[in-house]
Each structure stands twice: as C-alpha cells, then as structure tokens.
C-alpha cells in the first residue's frame, strides 16, 4: 500500500493545512514501515493543526493496530498569528479573539473515523515529552518554525524513537529562498550530525530518517 485512498483521502485534502498530497502519501508509507519494524509501539505527531496530515498518519497507525498521539497546543505557530503570512481568520475563537484549532482538529478526526486511533494531546511539546516514558515507532515533527521551537522539539523527542524507528520532518528546505531554515538546520542536520539517524527518503519538503543507533 503506497497511498491513502477513498473517503479518508478526500477528507484529508478538504482539511485546512499545509501538507501536499504527495508528501502525505510519503508520510503514510513511512508510518506503515515504522509499524512493521516496531510493532505495537505508539507513534507521535508534533504539530497537528487542523488534522490534515493526521488523517494520513492516523490511517497508517490504524492499519498497524497502534495508537497515534497528536501533540499540539492548538494556539497556532508564530507564522499563523494575526498579521503573519499564514494567518487564517476562520480559525480564531470569537469568544477569546485567539487562534484555536482544536475544534477543527477534533471534527477532522471524527469525520475520518480515527477517534479510536488518534489520541489528542493538548499542550507544549517539550513539556509532554518530559513525562513520556515509552519508546515510539515514529515521530513526525511538523511544529513551529522558530529556531528554538524546532530545536526543542527535536531535543525533546528524538531519544524516544526506538532503534529502527522513524523520524519524519516536514518543511525541510535546503535553499533559504524556498522556506525557513529551522526544520532543516535544527532538526534534520541535528539528526544527521548526531550519527543516530540515516536518510530513508525525501519527498518534497518531507524528510524521512531511521534510527540506526
């Protein structure tokens, strides 16, 4: 199986977010591989937004008969805030005036039939990681693009990935003209330079690595 199909694919593509179709399929394939190498271990997504990528990831986790923990504070990244390029006013909670993607995420999971597979974890990624005790088959980092945020996400979660497990990183751009450098320098290069991770695939801005030691 190389791609998400049927109604779930339609739901994913209808969901607000930044995951291109071909990269979603690559994420799906990577998660299936992680579940095969590390059977029974849960998976983690950092930065779920409205759940677009989570449909691909969660569908794979369901096939692997495991759980996906979707970690997000649901207040949006820096670039999603009012006045920034990627701000979406339809995601603002009128009662608070603040961005709140949680209701949209929960609706997406319900529509996709993934509420039994995807566990919604609302909070700061490093804080959640600090109390995490179990190895994971895969970690997909798609959080904020500020350098400290990206570095903290990697530092917090890379050690929880099991040997043979997968680290996937979104928005990896080697050329600064194409996008921010934090995911590339603070996560991808940090992983490669650690000697603990080796490249598996590159699809668009999605990089997939496996833990080798």
Region spans (language model):
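Phosphate/oxyanion-binding active-site loops and adjacent basic polyanion-contact surfaces
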Residues: 19-23
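S-adenosylmethionine/decaboxylated-SAM
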Residues: 2-18, 28-213
């Amino acid at each position: 199986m190389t791609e998400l199909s049927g109604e779930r694919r339609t739901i994913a593509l209808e969901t607000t977010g930044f995951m291109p179709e071909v990269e979603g399929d690559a994420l799906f394939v990577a998660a299936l591989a992680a579940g095969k190498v590390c059977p029974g271990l849960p998976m983690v997504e950092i930065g779920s937004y409205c759940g677009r990528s989570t449909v691909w990831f969660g569908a794979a986790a369901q096939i692997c008969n495991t759980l996906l923990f979707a970690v997000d504070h649901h207040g949006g990244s820096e670039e999603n805030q009012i006045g920034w390029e990627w701000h979406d006013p339809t995601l603002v909670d009128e009662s608070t005036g603040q961005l709140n993607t949680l209701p949209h995420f929960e609706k997406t999971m319900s529509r996709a039939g993934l509420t039994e597979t995807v566990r919604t974890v609302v909070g700061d990624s490093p804080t959640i990681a600090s109390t995490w005790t179990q190895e994971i088959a895969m970690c997909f980092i798609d959080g904020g693009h500020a350098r400290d945020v990206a570095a903290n996400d990697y530092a917090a979660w890379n050690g929880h990935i099991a040997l043979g497990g997968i680290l996937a990183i979104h928005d990896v751009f080697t050329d600064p003209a194409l996008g921010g450098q934090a995911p590339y320098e603070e996560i991808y290069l940090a992983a490669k330079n650690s000697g603990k991770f080796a490249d598996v695939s590159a699809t668009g801005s999605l990089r997939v690595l496996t833990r080798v030691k």
